C-alpha cells in the first residue's frame, strides 16, 4: 500500500539531514556506543520511543530511554534529564516527537560530550538547533503532515529497508490517528498498513488493552484507535506516568500486561 501510489512513496532520504542521521546512528552501532532515545508523554511520543528502541535493540544497540512526566518534568528536553543520560554513558541522543525548539538544551548536550539527532514533526523555529535535524517541515520533503512516530518510522526505513520498518507500522498507525494529523497521503497509507497488522497480529499489550476495554475479537478501525485505544494509552501520561503505556507496548507477560491494561482503562 505504501508504494502503490506515487504520492505515497516519498523516500525518507528526501528529509533534510536524514543521511547524516543514518550515518551517525550507524557509527554508534558500529562502535557499540550507548544510544539514548528521548521521547514525550503522549501517545505519539510513547509509540515513537517504542518504535525506535525496538529497531535499535534489534540491531544489538545498547539503549537508554527517557520519557518525561507531564506534571513533574513538563514537555520537551531538560538539562537535568540530558545530564542523567550522559552520566549513564550515552554519547548519542535521538529525540522523538520533541526537540525542535530545544536549542539551549541541545547546546548543553554538546558541551558534555553528547551528539544529538532531533527527529520531530512540530513546526521548527526560525533558528534550528545546532545538530542533525530530521523534520518533514524542514527542506524539500513532499509531505509535511507526518506525526512524530511517522518520522521515526521513516528513520527506521532509512536505516534498513521498507520491509524491516513495516514491523513497526502498527505503532506509527496508532500515533498517526491519536495525534490527529490529516489522514491523507503518507498518513493514510501508514494507517491502512498499520490497521492490517493490528487486526492480523496485535502486540500483546494492544491485545490486553482491547480485552480490558471489552473489545476483544472486534476489528480495529481508525475510529477504534481515536476513541478507544488512544485515550487509554494517553491516560498514564495525562494523570501520572507515561511509562505505564510504554511497558504495555513493550511487555510480553500476559498477567502483567492485563494489570497494566486494567489500570490504564480505569484511569481513562
Where are these regions (language model features)?
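Hydrophobic helix-and-loop "lid/oligomerization" segment in the mid-to-C-terminal part
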Residues: 1-92, 112-113, 160-268
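Conserved phosphate-handling catalytic cores of large alpha/beta enzymes
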Residues: 85-88, 93-95, 100-181, 187-190
